[in-house]
Curated annotation (Swiss-Prot):
Tagged with keyword Manganese: no
Catalysed transformations (reactions): heme b + (2E,6E)-farnesyl diphosphate + H2O = Fe(II)-heme o + diphosphate
Protein name listed in UniProt: Protoheme IX farnesyltransferase 2
Note: Carbon 2 of the heme B porphyrin ring is defined according to the Fischer nomenclature.
Compartments where located: Cell membrane
EC number(s) recorded for this UniProt protein: 2.5.1.141
């Protein structure tokens, strides 16, 4: 059973589910706990199903990379056919439950997010262009917007602008990881930003992107009148990102860069929690 759980990438999708929750709680006039639970279930299934497809389509790449060689498909713990059927069933269930529980507009963003990650990022661009992350990053927007339109009943500019906090985080996070494992990506022939430019350019660009991401979070929270309690979460989120990014920018060492990567997920989580407290 554990290999099938691993296929869902729970350590990755929890932030996307939290983004949906934050979008819903921020946008909804009144939080309905049954609706919130439905949103979480749909988020786990749709994001997890997309992640499982990623395992299927990248099994050859995973086998070549030290970071991913122990995943279920390269190790033969799950057959390709079983993994494909599992990914299809989980994804379909997520979409059907979204349509039944959340409605057409949230389901549109569920489908767009799934399509962005599975088709645009994984199948189309992952092996072709370093722009893969930028094009597939809409999956982050879609996660937030699924919850937002579910709570508000419509799409508006505040929701769109807030969704880009997740979008900006995605390339900064993934490129930081790819920098750490850049030799893995080169060996597998995957063109990530950190493998197609020199190391100095990669360090400077990714560090500055992290800084921009943190400042954008702060800007959003001030712009949309966050609850004062939320600043208890936003301040360390921004401060942590600025500190680790500046450290990586100055030291330009693998260790400093890894600390920046490790800080990025908690920083986004703190920002999303601040929105929940709005």
């Amino acid at each position: 059973m554990k290999p099938y759980l691993v296929l869902l990438k729970p350590r990755v999708i929890w932030l996307l589910v939290l983004a949906s929750v934050a979008g819903y709680v921020y946008a909804a006039p009144v939080v309905d706990w049954g609706s919130l639970l439905a949103l979480v279930v749909v988020g786990v299934l749709s994001s997890g199903g997309a992640a499982a497809f990623n395992h299927v389509f990248e099994r050859d790449i995973d086998a070549l990379m030290s970071r991913t060689a122990a995943r279920p498909l390269p190790r033969g713990l799950v057959s390709v056919g079983a993994a494909f059927a599992y990914a299809s069933a989980v994804s379909a269930l997520g979409v059907l439950l979204s349509l039944a529980w959340l409605g057409p507009l949230p389901t549109l963003f569920v489908v767009l997010g799934w399509f962005s990650y599975v088709v645009v990022y994984t199948v189309w661009l992952k092996r072709r262009s370093w722009l893969n992350v930028l094009a597939g990053g809409f999956a982050g927007n879609a996660s937030f917007l699924t919850g937002y339109v579910f709570g508000r009943g419509t799409l508006d500019w505040p929701g769109v602008l807030m969704s880009f906090a997740v979008y900006l985080w995605i390339p900064a996070h993934i490129w930081s990881l790819a920098y750490r494992y850049r030799e893995d990506y080169r060996r597998a022939g995957v063109p990530m930003f950190s493998t197609v430019v020199d190391q100095r350019t990669a360090v400077v660009a990714i560090s500055l992107l992290n800084i921009a991401s943190a400042l954008y979070m702060a800007f959003l929270y001030v712009l949309f009148g966050g609850d004062p309690l939320g600043y208890v979460f936003v301040a360390p989120a921004v401060g942590l990102t600025l500190y680790t990014s500046a450290l990586a920018l100055v030291k330009k060492s693998d260790d400093a860069f890894w600390k920046m990567f490790k800080a990025s997920s908690p920083a986004l989580a703190l920002f999303l929690i601040a929105l929940v407290l709005h």
